[in-house]
């Protein structure tokens, strides 16, 4: 079971989903997949930053993987032998919000795509050489600094706007207690995010050529961070058994 995401930052809602998955599928079978791709506005945290956040909440470091594309996670599946792949069911875990972005339409010839929704009773599931499955995790509502916050972007916004006390409380609400190391990471990385946002707001008052050059660099980084494939419809992993693919 692979729980993919960018996690900027990894928060209590993500941890609740991870806990739900471990109870449903077993802790030894669940892995979190994320990347080291960074961009100043939407993806400020490095892979090591996210590992620190996850392990603070109790995720075993051995079950966190640095991958090129979380929604394929070949770095995880490639560790299995051909025999293991023919006997292992592959499940990607997504929130209902994320699942809405995916296209599960049949292939052009009308046959089912590789990925299917996981049956509730799990009856008739096929190994990863034939199909992969999507499990929808429940949405968990929680409060940060006394305010509803159920998305990473909302948490970033709250932290940037908060005062010193607010920031310590946000960290305590996210990770159980104030943490100097996490405070340092959030201050540095979200400080860059705040600076980037302010530059965009003040662009008219700055030298046009410098603004254009800076914005081009930012946009390139943002495009790279957001270019991760999120359409599973025609995914064709290299471990598919061609003879049995459509059966």
Name each model feature, range by range.
Residues 1-201:
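Nucleotidyltransferase catalytic core that binds NTPs
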Residues 11, 72, 151, 207, ...:
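A diffuse structural propensity rather than consistent per-protein peaks
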Residues 95, 188, 192-208, 213-215, ...:
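Proteolytic processing junctions in secreted/extracellular precursors
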Residues 235, 244-247:
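Acidic, low-complexity, intrinsically disordered interaction modules
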Residues 28-30, 57, 62-65, 209-210, ...:
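Residue-level marker of intrinsically disordered, low-complexity segments enriched
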């Amino acid at each position: 079971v692979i729980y993919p995401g960018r996690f900027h930052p990894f928060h209590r809602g993500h941890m609740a989903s991870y806990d739900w998955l471990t109870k449903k599928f077993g802790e030894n079978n669940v892995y979190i997949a994320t990347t080291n791709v960074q961009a100043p506005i939407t993806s400020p945290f490095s892979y090591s930053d996210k590992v620190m956040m996850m392990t603070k909440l109790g995720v075993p470091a051995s079950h966190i993987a640095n991958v090129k594309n979380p929604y394929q996670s070949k770095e995880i599946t490639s560790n299995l032998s051909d025999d293991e792949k023919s006997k292992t069911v592959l499940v990607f875990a997504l929130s209902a919000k994320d699942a809405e972005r995916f296209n599960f339409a049949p292939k052009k010839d009308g046959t089912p795509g590789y990925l299917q929704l996981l049956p509730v009773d799990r009856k008739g599931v096929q190994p990863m050489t034939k199909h992969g499955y999507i499990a929808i995790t429940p949405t968990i509502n929680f409060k940060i600094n006394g305010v509803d916050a159920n998305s990473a972007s909302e948490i970033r916004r709250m932290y940037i706007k908060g005062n010193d006390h607010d920031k310590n409380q946000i960290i305590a609400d996210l990770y159980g207690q104030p943490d100097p190391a996490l405070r340092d990471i959030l201050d540095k990385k979200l400080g860059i995010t705040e600076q980037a946002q302010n530059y965009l707001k003040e662009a008219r008052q700055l030298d046009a050529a410098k603004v254009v050059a800076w914005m081009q660099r930012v946009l390139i980084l943002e495009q790279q961070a957001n270019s991760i494939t999120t359409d599973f419809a025609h995914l064709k992993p290299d471990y598919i058994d061609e003879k049995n693919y459509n059966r």
